[in-house]
Amino acid sequence: MVDARKNAPEQPPAGGWGALNATERQLARQKILVKGNRALLNMNKPGGFDCPSCAWPDPVKPHKAEYCENGAKAVAWEATAKRTGPIFFSEHSVSELRGWSDHALEDQGRLTHPLRYNRDTDRYEAVEWASALSEIGTINRQLDPDRIELYTSGRTSNEAAFLWQLYGRLLGTNNFPDCSDMCHATTTTALPESIGVGKGTVTLEDWEACDCLFIIGQNPGTNSPRMLALLHDMAKRGVPIITFNPLKERALVKFTDPQSPMEMLTGRGQAITSNYYQLRIGGDIVAMQALCKVVIEADDAARVRGDARIVDTAFIEEHTHGFAAFADYCRSLDWNEIERFTALTRAQLNQAAEIYMRSKRVIACWGMGITQHRNGGDAMQQIMNLLLLRGNIGKLGAGACPVRGHSNVQGDRTVGINKTPTEPFLQRLDRAFGFTAPRKWGHDTAECCEAILRGEVDAFLAMGGNFFRAIPDTERVSAKVQHLKLTVYVATKLNRSHLTPGEHSYILPALGRTEIDMQAEGQQTVTVEDSFAMVHGSTGQLKPASEHCRSEPWIIAQLAKGSVADRAAIDWDALVADYARIRDKIEAVIPGFDSYNARIAQPGGFHLPIAARQRKWDTPTGKANFLFAAGMMDEDDDVPERPHYQLMTIRSHDQFNTTIYSYNDRYRGVAGERMVVFMNQDDMARESLTEGDLITFRAVAQDGLERQVSGFKVVAYDIPSGCCAAYYPETNALLPLSHRDVRSNTPAAKSVPVQIVAQSAGTPVESAPEVSEQTPEAAGLISPLA
């Protein structure tokens, strides 16, 4: 059901009672109403556990309830009372389970036993830990390490990720496809070219001092809801919040703070965005350059008049390189072209630039609306150019803020999950563990998929995640997995990737972030790094889902003992008995972790050093660089004369990555379904479509392969003409592996060229998800909250 009234201007604010009700409903669905609410009071606080959802930082003084709606859903999903044990797998074949929806698979509950796939029965069967580990080790020892892939999910702790990279390098490979390859790897690769570091430069203290905020290609209401509390406070004190985003997102329009009694009583909420610019998909590069053009030309005029300069000349002269060439390029840009490629008017862009020029301390945020483009790195560098013009970096209240979407995705990279390790890192690793790590660069996610397609992979080992559902070209790649000799999935819940077994396949049940991790020397704490480079501890509070679940560090240690015990004199049992020993090794290998164990004992943890915060630039020029690609105007200019739309793939509000909590998207007025396409009304008229019509997407790709998915229901929405949006992972099959950012190989999932074809009555719906009989919606027990 889609209620168009929910998309109207008078729609209620985000947050408020809707968020509280949705939280309690999810806890009830997972049968942990009391237990779950008690656990939430310990989340994101010293001595408690870190949210397993997004990577937003914790405040110095936490609220009594320091969690958001979607963080609570993640906890409910992990701490559920439901279980997926051996009896379930004896009743359902893998072939049958492939017909289930993503939601239904995970909604069966927590995995309770190690499992081994039986090809004869087409079922997973319980297996003893010792047998599974021995068999995996035997197979791994026989393989060429260049044909082994080790995947890492973003919620993996620092301790587990460090052991995982150590295990992989002892095997002899740098093949480390990582979930960040599908989201913020663009930040990690492009930002260092500008400022010498691949992380954000701001802290929460900067947010409190900021006098202007830019939000570009991000939807915090769904992806980082705790960020809304800061946006709420900033808007309340009159800070201009400038949003560039194709879709009008409700949480960026108005938000009711659930922790404000007055707002909860009145339901009025706080307006968030002061200026909302709905630019065309792929228009970010030109939009940012247009703002720079206005600033530079205003500075030119001020210089001629003898007035105070608009750009920060002292900062530019001392700290930057390439300004003159960039300024000349911006001056040359034509406003007719700018308006055509951005779908914004000159007046709108002038307005945004005027606000920027009046402000003294500006923060710019971005999400995957920037990183998931073919030229995402170039777009990000234009954001940096805008900040550099007025010295908005390395001072209080200003800087760059990439908002990462998974709890420890930044930390995993920091501790060594990297296909291209530096020589200094490898030398420190060699000294710390007494072996010689491989120097040959490995695979990222896209390269791993390409290697699978070429038949060059024998083993795929996944530390969490849902790799074969999250990737582009899902159908092509997944079809090849059956030919792999080995697949190993460390997981908390059943998901679609587990239904693509290799010749030998295992599912190993892991503890979740919320659960007590008891090892030989007592209860353990793990650490994570948030989006602001703050490292802090996380200590589970709940009883494990099963006596057979094991911690990720323990699982890795046992895998290593079975595969690489003879390659270095490492006491794996001692490392796992007390994770402080793992942290000692991290301190020895990774710069910035001095006194690691002592500092995580402090409430809130510690910040890793970010050189650009001190205006130190680790770049070839020794300065921050103005970078641009001349003539790069459009995301879409390589498919001329082929009429198509630009599709952006998005999350629903009841979704975290490939995890689907329900079929509702409250903030967009959708309830009980996911197979929808959000379209501009003029485009609907052009295609002779009306609300509720079914369409087929056909990808417009350069490789000549046919990609299409069917059964999407048309929904009229506030989105620029020529653009449309639909949920992933249902649309991932449309995305070619080759359609990706040129630096990072991040899939260009926010700008997929597609044709929209109306389905005639009776056309079969190929991809519509089935609602499991076990879901409350299907049983009629709970009305979808809209």
Task: Label every PLM stretch briefly.
Residues 28-38:
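Short Cys/His-rich Zn2+-coordinating modules
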Residues 39-45:
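Short, flexible, mixed-charge glycine/proline-rich loop motifs
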Residues 48-54:
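Short cysteine-rich clusters marking metal-coordination/redox-active sites
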Residues 52, 124-212:
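Long, structured ligand/cofactor-binding scaffold of large enzymes
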Residues 57:
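Cys/His-rich metal-chelating microdomains
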Residues 76-123, 133:
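Low-complexity, highly charged intrinsically disordered N-terminal segments
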Residues 106, 115, 185-385, 389-395, ...:
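Non-catalytic alpha/beta scaffold blocks inside enzyme catalytic domains
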Residues 573-665:
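Long, low-complexity segments enriched in small/aliphatic residues
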